[in-house]
Amino acid sequence: MIPYGDFTFFLIALIALLPVIILGFLGKRSYIYNGVVTAFMIVLIFSSDKHNLFDQKYLSVQLISFIIYVVWQVLLIMFYYHSKPKNNSFSKFVTVMVLSILPLALVKVLQSTWLGGHQIHFHESKLIEFVGFLGISYVTFKSVQLIMEIRDGSIKEIKVWKLIQFISFFPTISSGPIDRYKRFVKDDKKVPTGNEYRELVLKAIHMIMLGFLYKYIVAYFINTYAIMPLQLDLHGFVNLWLYMYAYSLYLFFDFAGYSLFAIAFSYLFGIKTPPNFDKPFKAKNIKDFWNRWHMTLSFWFRDCIYMRSLFYMSRKKLLKSQFAMSNVAFLINFFI
């Protein structure tokens, strides 16, 4: 079941979260029930009629892949966290980072069109259908960012259960927004009062309504009455120009609607997941646009790729000009 893909998902999710909401209004939180409902929703999200074990749709291959992936990442992160005080060498950091990214790299290689007709098959299905799972990129971004923060020493404490919670948080598991571990744990530790939770619920309701408007009304109309007719005749500059803008608007309203749903359900858990969009089409320039479009991903690349590349070049004095180093870091950021 695709998260936020149909009304059935919303109905099931809201029923499952009803005890969470009731406890929230009482100024309480059950970490045990939160864990149970998260596990239930993850099983539902990864359910599959085609690729499963023992002909059980809820025992899907994607679910098994996800569990193995989470165990892999938790073992890597906890190993690095506990061994860092004794040995914080660059080689160990790189090794852990490579091992963390390895599952995603494997999935991307298997998905690549470079393989063409040479895709590896298993029982008449592509191997990639068994290896990957929905949201592997965004979960990997979380793990990589966490390893970097351990390296920097900005994270002082990591508990296994909190780490699993962070990686497998179901509202944002498929396509973000990408949260930060310290911010997530801070919200998770602080149980809001009844009045504070009431404000979160009101904001969540507003975002869900706005998300329905964006994704199921505006995006639908753009796709039905602009994109699909234009696809029938893409000859000529005007049609190509109209198609480009129509598709850009469709992407925004579809993805922004999804992001609003993800943030709203996060709020119902008492987790204030950061926003993903801030009126991107009002941007004054390309830099301002990327600071408004898919912000959590843009900021992730800025903090984890651009700033670190620039800092490394500055420390090693690889180039004399700060401007040149900034441009190189910018190119590395966009290449990745």
Each PLM stretch: what is its role?
Residues 1-336:
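Membrane-embedded transmembrane alpha-helical bundles that form the catalytic cores
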